[in-house]
């Protein structure tokens, strides 16, 4: 990325400070993405990165912000290096800033090697197709929107919804069955409030999940560039753990909306022509450089699975951030404000959610043979129950047929028993599927048209009770 032709060359020609940007005059050979050392007249040092060059000018984004910097007497030295971060397995169990520096009061981290933070998306030709189930312990995800190793599956949330709570639960519970020892979580918190940091720290430490988790944090009051770097630093460590140490790594990024706001802030500082709702026209490409670093690589045992979380402004799923994210990723988990208001946690709207790779990661030999059929039946039955609720609100429940009233009972049981679960409750996939059969048994057997007859005879509670009584 960087052009090292001005390596070590120092300038005192800062002509303008624009937001968090420095404009340096008289620079001819600076490289895009090149690291810059900045020294103020007081001796205080800061770091920056070249965002733009041309016409003898270099535009530098300052990591720590420009507060206190004066054009007069400020020295800018171009290093000829790109932004790198030291990586090590010792980073598991630690809390770090966007640059991989410990902020938990612990000992310094001894790096095994240094890696380019900007990284590269995985070459499509080198990709291995994702087809191994990841158990999150959450029925609405495992049963109906299954996560597959190497997938990128975002969570679309809204302001005030419990996405942080859900993220902490997934980070604590998720595992690849039979591969528990080689499973790690890399958690990137982008632009969060300090109380949110304390929540995540407490959630991981209380349950012991911190031992297999590396946290990268940029707070809301930190400069935009720190928020831009945070998910990339997390993915840099994830790539090392996955493809050098053969680990299965789940990367959770919250909140990508904060990331996009930082991207818009930097774009505005550079006076770029805005696109939809003021976001830069290259936001799609920029998001792809993050999301496409997830996956499996041929010849490697490890993998990177991504669950980015974003809050939809005004709950608008057509907003540019969720809209562009949906084009790049392989489905979405959508949280519902209506379910949240009914006291259901996690408030996952399964009808609006989708996992495009689910079919390849479930079924016989992966989860259980009846899983695909049961998921289809749950979708069909719950969809009809929701439709009948609207009809009952108009004509009254007593005007519905007996079968329709059973669908209403199913819908209520589905939400209260299947969707709803405790924050500390971890369900295996077998428990999830058995629970699905329990709520489906409310419906007449002839209504279970999506499930093969042999599975009904084997797994339906009615036949299980008969089989148990005959033993």
UniProtKB/Swiss-Prot annotation:
HAMAP family the record matches: ATP_synth_B_arch
The keyword Lipid metabolism is annotated on this UniProt entry: no
Gene (UniProt): atpB
Family designation: Belongs to the ATPase alpha/beta chains family.
Topological type in the membrane: Peripheral membrane protein
Keyword annotations: ATP synthesis, Cell membrane, Hydrogen ion transport, Ion transport, Membrane, Transport
NCBIfam families named among the record's database cross-references: PRK04196.1 (NF003235)
Quaternary state and interactors: Has multiple subunits with at least A(3), B(3), C, D, E, F, H, I and proteolipid K(x).
Role of this protein: Component of the A-type ATP synthase that produces ATP from ADP in the presence of a proton gradient across the membrane. The B chain is a regulatory subunit.
GO cellular component: plasma membrane
GO molecular function, one term: ATP binding
Name of the protein in its database record: A-type ATP synthase subunit B
The keyword Disulfide bond is annotated on this UniProt entry: no
Coiled coil: none
Subcellular location: Cell membrane
A single GO BP: proton motive force-driven plasma membrane ATP synthesis
Pfam family, one: ATP-synt_ab_N
Broad class of where this protein is predominantly found: membrane
């Amino acid at each position: 990325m960087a052009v090292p032709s001005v390596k070590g060359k120092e300038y005192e020609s800062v002509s303008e400070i624009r937001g968090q940007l420095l404009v340096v005059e008289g620079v001819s050979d600076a490289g895009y993405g090149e690291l810059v050392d900045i020294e103020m007249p007081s001796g205080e040092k800061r770091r920056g990165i070249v965002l733009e060059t041309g016409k003898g000018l270099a535009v530098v984004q300052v990591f720590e912000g420009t507060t206190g910097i004066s054009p007069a007497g400020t020295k800018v030295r171009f290093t000829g290096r790109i932004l790198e971060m030291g990586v090590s397995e010792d980073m598991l169990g630690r809390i770090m800033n966007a640059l991989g520096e410990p902020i938990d009061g612990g000992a310094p981290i001894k790096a095994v090697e240094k890696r380019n933070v900007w990284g590269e998306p995985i070459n499509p030709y080198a990709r291995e197709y994702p087809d191994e189930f990841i158990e999150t312990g959450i029925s609405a995800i495992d049963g109906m929107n299954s996560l597959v190793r190497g997938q990128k599956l975002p969570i679309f949330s809204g302001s005030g919804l419990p996405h942080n709570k859900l993220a902490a639960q997934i980070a604590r519970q998720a595992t690849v069955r039979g591969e528990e020892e080689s499973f790690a979580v890399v958690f990137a918190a982008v632009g969060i409030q300090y109380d949110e940091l304390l929540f995540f720290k407490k959630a991981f430490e209380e349950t012991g999940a911190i031992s297999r988790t590396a946290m990268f944090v940029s707070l809301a009051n930190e400069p935009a560039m720190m928020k831009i770097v945070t998910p990339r630093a997390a993915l840099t460590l994830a790539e090392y753990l996955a493809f050098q140490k053969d680990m299965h790594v789940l990367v959770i990024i919250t909140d990508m909306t904060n990331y996009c706001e930082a991207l818009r802030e930097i774009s505005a500082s550079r006076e770029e022509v805005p696109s939809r709702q003021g976001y830069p026209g290259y936001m799609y490409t920029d998001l792809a450089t993050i999301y496409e670093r997830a996956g499996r690589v041929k010849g490697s045992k490890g993998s990177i699975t991504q669950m980015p979380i974003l809050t939809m402004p005004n709950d608008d799923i057509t907003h540019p951030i969720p809209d562009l994210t949906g084009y790049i990723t392989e489905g979405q988990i959508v949280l519902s404000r209506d379910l949240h208001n009914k006291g259901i946690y996690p408030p996952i709207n399964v009808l609006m959610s989708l996992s495009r790779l689910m079919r390849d990661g479930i079924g016989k030999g992966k989860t259980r043979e009846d899983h695909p059929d049961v998921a289809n039946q749950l979708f069909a039955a719950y969809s009809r129950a929701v439709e009948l609720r609207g009809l009952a609100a108009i004509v009254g429940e007593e005007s519905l047929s007996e079968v329709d009233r059973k669908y209403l009972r199913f819908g209520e049981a589905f939400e209260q028993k299947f969707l709803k679960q405790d924050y500390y409750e971890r369900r295996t996939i077998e428990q999830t599927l058995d629970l699905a059969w329990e709520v489906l048994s409310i419906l007449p057997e002839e209504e279970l048209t999506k499930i093969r007859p042999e599975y009904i005879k084997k797994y339906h509670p009615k036949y299980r009770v008969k089989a148990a009584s005959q033993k």
